[in-house]
A protein has these predicted regions:
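Membrane-interface amphipathic segments in extracytoplasmic regions
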Residues: 1-268
Length: 268
């Protein structure tokens, strides 16, 4: 890498962008199944956030504080400036973004960083330190996770970068994907539960054969038994269910019948 390359910002993305006229981005919120696509699309650039640079809104505030917040903020700001400028100068940029129903997505994100979320619970609730109550996990999830994150992700990330407002275009719930175009940006949004049936469409979109390679991560995680028990016993508060399932995000990407099924799932 040349001495003129920008200083260490986790530079793999920079080198990949520099080498490609028509880069492919797997650009989506975390915990929607991105690892399957990463392994299936060589030389793709994987992003969860670029335009939003406040780490505490995306991950546990406790975890964010472990990474020198001031330095991390500057790094994220520089990455946004450099990458967005490079992307807008490319001949074509293809972006794939997976979506998932938001409550399930937030549960997966919670467990991925479980120690940090529990630390936030203990730091903010003195009674939690002395308690052995089984609902501590439920309380930590409801009280400390930023539940708005998936609902706002497209408005905070895709729209500022590409100018594409996915909510102004109908989404084909049966097909499970939609393609959008603006200037040099092509965006394909795919529902993760429709990923396998969308492989041919993804291949057409990327102009290369794509075979999605699944490796089920959740069953092999250290927290798998806890996650199974959490899902068995967790009954979200009505306010949380309604906030998530009546949101613009959920109504756009899921049909009325599918949302009714999600209500049944989380109210049961």
């Amino acid at each position: 890498m040349s001495s003129s390359t920008p200083i260490s910002l986790s530079m793999q993305w920079y080198q990949l962008l520099k080498e490609q006229d028509s880069p492919v981005l797997i650009y989506q919120m975390g915990k929607v199944g991105s690892s399957a696509l990463e392994k299936s699309i060589p030389k793709s650039i994987h992003l969860h956030d670029l335009m939003s640079i406040d780490a505490e809104k995306q991950i546990s505030p406790v975890r964010a504080q472990l990474h020198n917040p001031a330095t991390n903020y500057i790094k994220r700001l520089l990455k946004r400036l450099i990458m967005s400028r490079m992307l807008k100068r490319k001949k074509q940029v293809r972006i794939i973004s997976l979506v998932r129903e938001p409550i399930g997505r937030n549960i997966s994100m919670f467990f991925q960083s479980l120690p940090f979320w529990m630390a936030a619970k203990y730091l903010n609730d003195d009674s939690a330190v002395r308690s052995e109550r089984s609902q501590l996990l439920h309380e930590a999830f409801e009280e400390h996770v930023n539940h708005q994150y998936p609902l706002e992700w497209f408005d905070n990330e895709i729209k500022p970068l590409t100018g594409i407002d996915v909510f102004t275009h109908p989404f084909d719930h049966e097909l499970g994907y939609q393609v959008y175009q603006k200037d040099n940006f092509s965006l394909m949004v795919v529902r993760v539960d429709k990923l396998d049936q969308s492989q041919k469409a993804i291949s057409t979109f990327l102009q290369q054969e794509v075979k999605v390679q699944h490796d089920n991560q959740a069953d092999n995680k250290w927290y798998s038994p806890l996650l199974v028990e959490f899902k068995r016993t967790f009954h979200p508060k009505v306010a949380l269910i309604e906030e998530m399932l009546t949101s613009k995000f959920t109504k756009h990407f899921f049909s009325t019948k599918e949302i009714e099924n999600l209500h049944t799932l989380y109210y049961s």
